[in-house]
Curated annotation (Swiss-Prot):
One of its GO terms (cellular component) is HslUV protease complex. The lineage of its organism: Bacteria, Bacillati, Cyanobacteriota, Cyanophyceae, Nostocales. Residues 1-51 form the ClpX-type ZB domain. It comes from Trichormus variabilis (strain ATCC 29413 / PCC 7937). ATP binds at P143, T144, G145, C146, G147, K148, T149, L150. This is ATP-dependent Clp protease ATP-binding subunit ClpX. GO terms for molecular function: ATP binding; ATP hydrolysis activity; ATP-dependent protein folding chaperone; protein dimerization activity; unfolded protein binding; zinc ion binding.
Amino acid sequence: MSKYDSHLKCSFCGKSQEQVRKLIAGPGVYICDECVDLCNEILDEELLDTSGAAAQPAPKSEPPQKRRARSSNLSLSQIPKPREIKKYLDEHVIGQDEAKKVLSVAVYNHYKRLAILQSKGSSKNGADDAVELQKSNILLIGPTGCGKTLLAQTLAKILDVPFAVADATTLTEAGYVGEDVENILLRLLQVADLDVEEAQRGIIYIDEIDKIARKSENPSITRDVSGEGVQQALLKMLEGTIANVPPQGGRKHPYQDCIQIDTSNILFICGGAFVGLEKVVDQRGGKKSIGFVQPGEGQSKEKRAADVLRHLEPDDLVKFGMIPEFIGRVPMVAVVDPLDEEALMAILTQPRSALVKQYQKLLKMDNVQLDFKPDALKAIAQEAYRRKTGARALRGIVEELMLDVMYELPSRKDVTRCTVTREMVEKRSTAELLVHPSSLPKPESA
């Protein structure tokens, strides 16, 4: 036995030679007796399912999204048009027309690239085969709670390709504690049911991308493992490379089998708040004392900041902390507007899964009708706007407001209707709705 035998591990479960009864060696890999038994059980179950398939009823059909995602045949007639994509986004997300247009066009062009790649081998394309369509990754910039992540999540519901959402804050440079950038591809692979070919046609949304900006404009002497190091690691993935993805996630090690994924046809959408970026843009124009910094008439500070960001240039992102190579790989930039009080009121009631509709459905299950007076909705929107966390503040306010009612109603049979008023919103409590049972003369009509 060589001196290295004590360090041998199973390539599948990771157990060492001392922890198992038998370790079988192959060309560069090892498997223990426990994993062999597990593989035999899986094969026996599959053979049993296959032999009994004729006697079993037909399996349930997959959800439409899954069924479409497995289809690899794309034609131009089946591709949703940009207007159709935006119309669906309008049903779930309030405002943000510019960002919706950018996303709709990008997704539509992504579909067309996939359709062309599938028909590239046919001779009827003629001279067009020499024209290669390259992808245009997207960067969404906007304050917290304005709908960046919701746009991506809503987009995922209507796509015929796998869609994964990742968080940049958990990523670190290779060799350090944290997640490798390849774990982003693992999420996409899991959405595609481990179908590599399907995953290579997908779309990835990387949230909180501004959190990997380097800490200073000048290169640092010490390593920035969660900032510039992550940007460097993402470069080839964004542009297109063959990445080795560990199937179980985590760090890669020499004895691990990896899945190879070509990222050339994966569309990347990056989003972040980029707090303070508007100041960089303002300073470039020599407007340190004017523009959005000073209070003006008719516009909020956040709205003026969004207007300044519409004059954004790549150099501004470099000064913020993004490296030039990264910026060059996300050529499409869309600014997401902050939400004002009117937009927050619309978010409460208009979307298909609006917050008010959710609570009405919850109370309906207890046979109680829930109503919000217009001035109550306005008060909720005003408080959410004051908290400066965008639409995320709405749920916190309504949850706090409805706590007493939702605690008591399941045990009460004498309340059939609840009407929330502005006074209740200001008190942050709906407890008074439970004082007078509905069997008494209606107190709200008095």
